[in-house]
Design a protein with these regions (language model features):
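Conserved acidic donor-binding segment of nucleotide-sugar-dependent glycosyltransferases
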Residues: 313-314, 318-325, 334-340
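Aromatic "clamp/platform" in nucleotide-sugar-dependent glycosyltransferases that forms part
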Residues: 262, 281
């Protein structure tokens, strides 16, 4: 396909949407496209120099006349500047609000008829979509986009349920860089964490928000621990951390729970893990599950949102109902005490990632989408010239 000039806007901090947006930009650059990140800071995963990747900082000044910093206006203005200067073909924004709305405003400001692609990641729909004061803004951003994608079928359906839009939505799953997330042997790392030979390692990684349901993670682990020797690695930080620490301190198994805080090299932690738990109350996809599976770690997740689209029950993990910590424990013990079954689940996890979420497959889907948007724009311009 023709090499395109593509702008990407996302939240540059740690989080699934920022990770996917940044990795997408890097992989598109490796395929020869020119990528322009338009964000408030350098995306944290943009850790390599590319000759065809550019960063345009959105500077937000604090003016005394405004109660809050005018990020949205500053972003739209920066988008318009970059669009005119670089002659972008596509602006791919992650989140309907504020980013899609800002993109539409930037198109009006710049006078350039470029294509707007909006990817819905979950929070913009599952949380904000339930706020009646924001629903119309979300609908506006979606309806004025030239193409809209969702990271799971569940999120796509939820969008139609919550937002009164008739816009077509394509499901394009998240992906992982399999050069980074892959099985490695780091058995010596277990010793550093005090993991004994007969202990299995269970891992949970999140931002420790209430929605991630940490109390059930810990409660499930304690039930597992009653049946077998194991360690729980809690990776991350956030508002629920102190509450969870209190829950752990009250248990006889407090010495088997390790709080590791935020970690950069989570592939090393997956290398010593046997099972991933994700028991969220809401989850549009569950990128961390995919990262674990790419390292050969099966998972147990709740029957929520896009999680059942990642975990195939009884094949590469298990699906449980929200709140059913006994089922989590039963499945975990059943799996972790059967080495043959665990090995089978590990292989199935690797196969699932390669077959359904391979980076090249997903990138090709985005390229096809961009090509379609650009072709439609060119057709519209041709028709307008004839008229």
């Amino acid at each position: 396909m023709k090499k395109l000039k593509i702008g990407i806007t996302c939240y540059p901090t740690v989080g699934g949407s920022g990770v996917i947006a940044t990795e997408l930009g890097k992989m598109l650059a490796e395929r020869g496209h020119e990528i322009h990140f338009i964000t408030s800071s350098v995306p944290f995963r943009l850790n390599k120099i590319y000759p065809n990747v550019f960063f345009h900082e959105v500077e937000v000044n604090n003016y005394s006349v405004f109660q809050y910093p005018p990020y949205d206006i500053a972003l739209a203005s920066k988008m318009a500047d970059v669009i005119k200067e670089e002659q972008l073909d596509i602006l791919h924004v992650h989140y309907a609000i504020p980013h899609a709305v800002c993109a539409v405003l930037a198109r009006d400001m710049s006078g350039q008829d470029f294509g707007i692609v909006t990817t819905l990641h979950g929070t913009d729909i599952s949380v904000l979509g339930e706020d009646s004061t924001l629903a119309q803004a979300i609908k506006y951003g979606i309806d004025r986009s030239d193409a809209v994608t969702a990271v799971s079928e569940a999120l796509k359906q939820q969008t139609y349920d919550l937002i009164d839009t008739k816009a077509p939505i394509d499901t394009i799953y998240n992906f992982v860089d399999e050069n980074v997330f892959k099985p490695v042997d780091l058995g010596n790392l277990k010793e550093q964490f005090g993991v004994k030979e007969d202990e299995k390692v269970i891992i949970h990684i999140s931002n420790f928000r209430k929605i991630k349901n940490l109390p059930d993670i810990v409660a499930s682990f304690f039930k597992i621990r009653e049946k077998m020797p194991a360690k729980l690695l809690l990776v991350g930080d956030g508002p629920e951390k102190h509450r969870i620490m209190d829950q752990v301190k009250a248990s006889a198994y407090k010495g088997d729970v390790l709080f590791l805080g935020k970690q950069e090299n989570i592939t090393e932690l997956f290398a010593i893990s046997d099972l991933k738990l994700l028991l969220s109350e809401k989850e549009s996809f569950g990128l961390v599950l995919l990262e674990a599976m790419a390292c050969g770690v099966p998972g147990i997740g709740t029957a929520i949102g896009g999680i059942p689209e990642v975990i195939e029950h009884g094949v590469n993990g298990y699906i449980v109902e929200l709140g059913d910590t006994q089922a989590v424990a039963d499945y975990a013990v059943q799996l972790l005490q059967d080495e043959d079954k665990l090995a089978s689940f590990r292989q199935a996890a690797l196969y699932s990632v390669s077959e359904n979420f391979h980076e090249h497959k997903i990138i090709k889907q985005y390229e096809d989408l961009y090509e379609r948007v650009v072709a439609n724009k060119n057709d519209s311009k041709t028709m307008a010239q004839r008229d």
